[in-house]
Regions:
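N-terminal pre-triad scaffold of radical SAM enzymes
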Residues: 1-30, 47-65, 69, 98-100, ...
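Alpha-helix termini
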Residues: 49-55, 86-89, 284-285, 318-319
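Auxiliary Fe-S-binding modules of radical SAM enzymes
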Residues: 2-5, 212-356
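Conserved non-cysteine loop/helix-boundary elements of the Radical SAM core domain that shape
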Residues: 28-40, 65-158, 163-221
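A general structural motif
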Residues: 4, 56-58, 92-94, 117, ...
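Short glycine-enriched loops at secondary-structure junctions
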Residues: 12-16, 193-198, 244
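Residues at or immediately flanking beta-strands
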Residues: 60, 94-96, 158-160, 291-293, ...
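Short acidic/His/Gly/Ser-rich catalytic and metal-binding motifs that mark active-site loops
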Residues: 18-20, 198-204, 249-251
Length: 356
């Protein structure tokens, strides 16, 4: 499969009809709201980013940070006209954009298709109406479903859905139900961004006045793991977990509270490997004199071992207390996100994330 690359162009908060309680796109993207892209700046940015692209990579020009289809039509046309030139000449493979569910309709899709748009991401955030209302999204869960139905009438367009667990009024149960509802909507991919308290948002005020409590890192990891599992079992990729750790987000006074971590996805994978290790320990005969071999794909070794190797050390300690010994074997033939084991030369048994 070809590696995917985005040529990122930011339209922070532009096209949005209102301020959601969690949003400050200028802070998140590092671009100011009033910095409108021009034809010249679009071309310059695309050309600069194309110098880093290698042959064999699948490239999309991606408009991030706002509700693209809410922009003035003349501005949309300027941006898409420039982007389409690169599609027509074969220098990029398509165009990606993000927007609101209530800013999608058949005539809008016809317009986007005419300019070569290949991917639309919808910021659904939650499929619980109470959470959407408290977050001042201005749309309902039903409107998300309607937008998905419209986009699915155009098979050439990939559909992505973004989820923000931990918003006001959210619970683990609601977030899991959102994930299960998303499975029914069958997007091509998803993103999971646990809610953060960003400076300059209404969430900052709610947090300061003790009306909102963000998830801790530990809670966000557990919630995201529970959200990811139904998506994994349905074969729906989660292409990002946690906001990208941009220089602006890392800056002092930007993220005021919440589960921000530069390696958030790895924390979630560590959590699920801990669960697999626990399941494995329940299945093997502790105290056996036979040596235990634990097999893992090399790319998963860090997640299996856990932070500072704690998960693996704990497993070894339990085995040692019962008189058993174990060794870790790296096996490229083992699928990713799967744990295998065998007693000496016995048959290999295995468990995957999808078995949890």
């Amino acid at each position: 499969m070809k590696q995917h690359v985005n040529i990122a162009l930011f339209v922070p908060h532009q096209g949005c009809p209102k301020d959601c309680v969690f949003c400050n796109q200028a802070r998140i993207t590092g671009r100011k709201r009033e910095n409108m892209l021009t034809e010249e700046t679009v071309r310059r940015s695309i050309e600069e980013q194309l110098t880093t692209v290698h042959s064999g990579q699948e490239v999309e020009i991606a408009f991030f940070g706002g509700s693209f289809t809410g922009l003035p039509r003349s501005y949309q046309t300027m941006l898409l006209t420039v982007a389409k030139e690169y599609v027509v000449t074969g220098r990029v493979h398509g165009i990606r954009l993000s927007t609101r569910p209530d800013y999608i309709a058949p005539h809008i899709m016809e317009y986007l298709i005419s300019y070569g748009v290949t991917t639309v991401e919808l910021g659904c955030q939650s499929l619980d109406d109470e959470v959407l209302n408290l977050s001042k999204r201005g749309h309902t869960a039903a409107q998300v479903e309607q937008a998905v139905q419209v986009i699915r009438q155009y098979p050439s367009v990939q559909l992505g859905l973004q989820i923000l667990p931990g918003l006001p009024g959210d619970t683990l149960e609601k977030s899991v139900r959102t994930a299960e509802a998303i499975v029914e909507l069958a997007p091509d991919f998803t993103r999971i961004y646990p809610a953060l308290v960003i400076a300059g948002t209404e969430l900052e005020w709610l947090y300061a006045t003790h009306q909102y409590k963000p998830l801790s890192i530990e809670e966000a990891v557990r919630w995201t793991a529970e959200i990811w599992l139904p998506l994994l079992k349905a074969g729906i990729p989660v292409i990002r977990m946690g906001l990208h750790a941009s220089d602006d987000l890392r800056g002092e006074g930007t993220v005021l509270a919440g589960p921000f971590h530069p390696s958030f996805r790895q924390l979630v994978e560590e959590e699920l490997f801990r669960r697999l290790l626990k399941r494995m320990m329940e299945r093997i005969a502790l105290g056996s004199t036979a040596s235990l071999q634990v097999l893992i794909h090399p790319a998963d070794e860090t997640a299996l071992r856990g932070r500072k190797g704690e998960s693996w050390k704990q497993a070894l300690s339990i085995l040692s207390d019962t008189g058993s010994k174990a060794s870790l074997i790296l096996d490229r033939n083992l699928p990713r996100r799967q744990l295998g084991w065998r007693m000496e030369e016995g048959p290999v048994q295995s468990l995957a994330f999808t078995d949890l």
